[in-house]
Amino acid sequence: MARSKTAQPKHSLRKIAVVVATAVSGMSVYAQAAVEPKEDTITVTAAPAPQESAWGPAATIAARQSATGTKTDTPIQKVPQSISVVTAEEMALHQPKSVKEALSYTPGVSVGTRGASNTYDHLIIRGFAAEGQSQNNYLNGLKLQGNFYNDAVIDPYMLERAEIMRGPVSVLYGKSSPGGLLNMVSKRPTTEPMKEVQFKAGTDSLFQTGFDFSDSLDDDGVYSYRLTGLARSANAQQKGSEEQRYAIAPAFTWRPDDKTNFTFLPFLLPERAGNRLLRLVAERGNR
């Protein structure tokens, strides 16, 4: 009996301690809930896609607009023909010395039919030659006149994009090869200031320098200009042969209103290159 009398106060003390601890914890939870601030509402708005023109720079390496298939500024996904576009941004990554080098990774296009020479942009599209009498090379939608080894050549540094349209195109472009055509788009003046100077050196004693400047001539952007130039010298694959290319392309744009613009796109590209079609090598020694 004595043990039970002495144990009873201990149980009472434990019960009191549990009740007090529960009350204190409840007060702390209530206090935390009371001081917790309200969550702010965050609204996320997607940025609009950058505007792109079929005759201007692409927002990314993959172009979304083209004028080759319809001769109008049309989304590529809405053009029924098969079109591949190599943009200036992609060319800057690969650093091609010719347009055919820029098209090396384009499906359905063979570029190595004339060896290592960069003098001509000879292409084979879907098994059909794009040079010769058909001359399927175009600049800004206009055919570059030429015949076999008398073809007009454009340096890729002068271009905003190079586009390949595969398949028959005589409905839009007249007489042409059934394999397809190459359409090159020149760099055009911009209303935002742009300045670029490059120096490049490489194998075969390659040395190249170029510049690309563009800006608006007035505050309203009515008149703008662009001046692109290039000078390159390198040894050819054959010993004793040398390639020299100089190019300059001044451009001027007049925008009388928001829906009208006139752009002048002259260019000059003199080139000096050794003959790679036939080379006789003198042999020394007794016969």
Language-model features, listed with the residues they occupy:
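Cleavable N-terminal targeting peptides that direct proteins into the secretory/outer-membrane pathway or into
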Residues: 1-38
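Short, flexible loop/turn elements at secondary-structure junctions
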Residues: 18, 22-24, 129, 203, ...
